[in-house]
Amino acid sequence: MQVILLDKVVHLGNIGDQVNVKSGFARNFLIPQGKAVMATKANIEYFEARRAELEAKAAEVLAAAQARAAKLAELGSVTIASKAGDEGRLFGSITTRDVADAVTAAGVEVAKSEVRLSTGPIRTLGDHEVKFQLHGEVFATINVIVVAE
């Protein structure tokens, strides 16, 4: 199925590219999320008329993500208190939601879907490096310090 990309899609293409994808991927992911439209003659003409507007919008979103990444770098680290046993193991774990809530409380708005815990949930006390993917190509890293309550 031929589609026109309205946004940059990782491993697929940039704004305005006409790509051939499986119909299920187009119908269930790209089109509902507004990342692509079917490549009909009318849509091609419509897209060419709006190309500059869509590229400006994409640049604006990228600039906003870079500004948030700079704020995260400025923040540096976040402390999360959790109940823990004597050996330094937590009762429960620190998940992406907990990290996102702590960073948001510290003053930088992030969603839990933007948090990347490389080794899964945090289960021990101490310093842990957490990555954030704020945009397709904008990443930030902060240090999460887990302390016992």
From Swiss-Prot:
UniProtKB keywords: Ribonucleoprotein, Ribosomal protein, RNA-binding, rRNA-binding
GO MF, any single term: rRNA binding
Transmembrane segments: none
Gene Ontology cellular component annotations, sorted alphabetically: ribonucleoprotein complex; ribosome
Any one of the GO BP annotations: translation
Domain of life according to the entry: Bacteria
InterPro entries hit by this protein: Ribosomal_bL9, Ribosomal_bL9/RNase_H1_N, Ribosomal_bL9_bac/chp, Ribosomal_bL9_C, Ribosomal_bL9_C_sf, Ribosomal_bL9_N, Ribosomal_bL9_N_sf
Record's function text: Binds to the 23S rRNA.
Family recorded in the similarity comment: Belongs to the bacterial ribosomal protein bL9 family.
Protein name: Large ribosomal subunit protein bL9
Species name: Pasteurella multocida (strain Pm70)
